[in-house]
Amino acid sequence: MRNTEMIPNVPVSFQRTRRMSKGRVLTSGDAGKILPIKADPILREEGFSGNVNVSVEMMETSEKPVNAIVAKACTYFVPYLAFDQFNGSIDELNRSYSKENGIAGSPISFFEKNKYYNGSSVVTDSTPTDMDTGDNGRSTFYGTMGLHHGVADMNSSYVQAYNAIVNHRRKARSTSLAVRNEFEHDLAEAFWPNEGNSHIMADFDQKLIDGEVALNGLTFSAPLRSTMAGKNDNSLTSGLATSTTDSFSPASVLADVTFGSGILRPDGTTGSAFLFSDVWAELTQGGDARMSLADIEQARKTAAFAKLRAAYDGIDDEYIIDLLMQGITVPTEVMKQPMLIGSQTGMFGFSQRFATDSGNLDDTATNGFVSLGYRVRAPRTSIGGVVMTCLEIAPERVWERKKDYFLYTTDTDNLPNALRDSLDPEKVAVVKKNHLDVNHSTPDATLGYAPLNHEYNRDQINVGGKFYRPANDAYTEVRSRIWTNETTDPSLSTDFYLCTNLHKKIFADQVSDSFEITAVSDLTVDTNVVFGQRLIEADATSDYETITNLVDATRITK
């Protein structure tokens, strides 16, 4: 007998099965973009594990590139709660899944369908026929993934998952990077690889580093003094009269006098006002500032908790951060953002071939190749979502004019000093714009901020000899083997973080896609899905009927 005072809320248990989610991809793309390679749907109450392998071939270049070219493959699990229509609410997701009205009273579609972003607003295609060939990036997005669209509705889960990944990474990198619309189909810019300047920040929390100690005993009234005061006058001079009805000395400040109307006020208007010169307050009377050891300890604890809170940057809801800071577990919070479940980075290796005909023995052709592989896994979740594999290809950025701080040191006082630096209360250095380019037009302007003595964690790339960059940035053929964006007057703008406007001058074919990509994914999914038995092809004669006819169905009659 069931205890009638208990209502069960455990879901019905089914025999678990396994389903395969395999994929082979052949596609192409350019460097400087985050390429969506493969997407696998994960249903509710499913977990998975498997392998992802990606191979990339770089198309022919006339010369062998001299700087590193990096490929990075990463696979994310994007839960459905990361999609905007659910607003991070598991209750909203469950209602939507069951086609019930949402919390606001109106139904919410579990699958957004036929939507794309046109640059200013989200558009719903009422007669979807061209999602794989349409404008606003749709043909590029679905074409890169190798997906075709028939005359039917198409859900937007893949593009939503893609943009959730991009936005998650941008928030983690810098608050200055723009967030994309979740239905934007244009391919996002890739991040620069092996960035040796990621320690430089545009701003920092100075209060977090300095700390603040409250001083008690300063809530008192202090006498206010002035060497000269007057009214109804546009200015004060040393010869100001003190006996007329329009002016007064400090000794008669409290006198009952009549205001005039001719004073030029700080806001530019004219009217009645007093003018004071050399104003000060006497703080020696009535005040007693105190700072206790408890105040110092409070400042230390405040700074420590502020550092913990800073780690939650990127979570949109302040109340969620407040709950986490109180030590309260928010079970669904981890399901509101993409989860990196596997990644690998590799550099291209090059194969150079020389011409064999007698007239062109100096001519060469170069191809590059890189292979990446890793395992992925995720436990069983009640949410479900999309597993998406993305690929980024970009050359290593070459800061040829990056400052060598030791070379510019002419005084030992400018070298690190353990005692002085240990006593430094902030341990933060101001980074000038000549850090990235010693020929910057405003070398002493502030680029950003970095940890103290950051310049002695050296990460230099020096290019010299025939490859030396000329002062006027004039084009030289030999330097065309360096594949990079030569930025004039670099700053902490979008170009500093993302591969914007990456050229294709090093390739023999500057029109076609520069990289050919093959990928193989093999996932085993633990699921509740019920599969039918394997079918056996049969002819017109039923095997079941044949066997039935052989059975003696008669019974003995008594």
Predicted feature locations:
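Intrinsically disordered, low-complexity segments
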Residues: 1-558
